[in-house]
Amino acid sequence: MKRQKRDRLARALSKGYQAGMQGRSKEQCPYFAIDARSHWLGGWRQAMEDRPGLAK
C-alpha cells in the first residue's frame, strides 16, 4: 500500500518549528508562496516560545 505524502502546509509548519528550535533566523525561510511561508513562520514562532532559556 502506498504511503500518502503529508500535507505541504503541515510540512512547512514542522520545518519552521525545527528551524526555530535550532536557533535559525526567520529570514532563512525557504518558502516563497504566501501560504507555505506563513505556516513556516508560524512554526518558527511557536518554537521561539517553546525554547527554554530565552526571555523576551
Curated annotation (Swiss-Prot):
GO terms for biological process: regulation of translation. GO terms for cellular component: cytoplasm. Keywords: Cytoplasm, Translation regulation. InterPro entries: Ribosome_modulation_factor (IPR007040), RMF_sf (IPR023200). Pfam families: RMF (PF04957). It is found in: Cytoplasm. During stationary phase, converts 70S ribosomes to an inactive dimeric form (100S ribosomes). Belongs to the ribosome modulation factor family. This is Ribosome modulation factor. It comes from Proteus mirabilis (strain HI4320).
